Amino acid sequence: MSAYLIVRAQVAPEDREAFDHWYQTEHLPDAHAAFKSLSAQRGWVEDNPSLHVAIYAFSDLAEAQAIANGSPQITELIAEFDRVWQDRIHRTREVVGVVQSLQR
């Protein structure tokens, strides 16, 4: 089944506007292309406006894990993220394998 790479970023209020613009115009398109993900989406958590979430979809768990676990693609994107934001933004990454999917 499919899998997702989920990246959460804790963004300070004073960085939110610049981060949002950068992620929209540079980082999400670059990551989507580098990862060759099926789709890439992002948003802000409604009840925690400092929490940004990006979701990259893959056809299977092995593909998502290969990207997330130290691939050259993610290593390069992490380096660019760190260059732009230094240590101001803490982030976490999880790979989630879909075990059940219902559709309407």
What are the roles of these predicted feature ranges?
Residues 1-104:
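Macromolecular interaction modules
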